[in-house]
Amino acid sequence: MGKTDLSSLLAEKLKARLVLENPEENPFLLDFYNEKKRYAFQTQIFFLLSRYKQQQNFLEHDLFMKKVISDYFFEKDKIFASVNLDEKELFLYERIYSLLIKNVPKPDLILYLQSDPQTLYKKLRKKRKKQFQKIELDYLMALNEAYNRYFFHYDETPLLILNSDDFDFQKNPSHLDELLELLKKPQKGRRYYVRR
């Protein structure tokens, strides 16, 4: 089960609004997976601006919504940019990013689903969408390393880290109940949760 499926389950159980990213909207994504260097900047800027727009729409329309579950956090864009862009592109990207991030709300909690890149690679191979078929294991390993490095230093909001390889939220309802109980507890700092 991926982040989108888990977000959907959590939103349903917690009666929360669900906010999903939509990578299929990005007209550069398939080109990026075919020619990373050539299409990285366009792909990344499109994602940055579309995620920013989604965050702004969310702020305008849901001022009184108490619970919101999203399958991404805005800062993820910067993690991908650090892997995908060359030095000059990253410099320009970071200038744009720094202007936008000021207006993006911070989440109350980030749930980081860690997964072994090999396991993730196998799961992506089973998906039918074209863009997932083009993703290489080396790329997943680089992203995994970038995420781990980012979250090792992250302290802006509470962070709960789970190894998603230890859970099967769809097939085993007790795993979802376990997570829901965990989410009811006050969240502070960085916490790792390991199933026993």
Residue ranges: model-predicted function:
Residues 77-148:
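A glycine- and Lys/Arg-enriched "phosphate-lid" helix/loop adjacent to the NTP-binding pocket
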Residues 125-133, 138-196:
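NTP-dependent small-molecule kinase module
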Residues 19, 70, 109-111, 160-162:
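Hydrophobic/aromatic beta-strand patches that form the interior of the parallel beta-sheet core
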Residues 8, 12-50:
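Conserved substrate/cofactor phosphate-moiety recognition/catalytic segment
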Residues 23-26, 74-76, 115-120, 166-169:
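Conserved nucleotide-binding/hydrolysis micro-motifs of P-loop NTPases
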Residues 3-4:
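Walker A/P-loop
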Residues 39, 43-105:
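Glycine-rich phosphate-binding loop used to anchor ATP phosphates in small-molecule kinases
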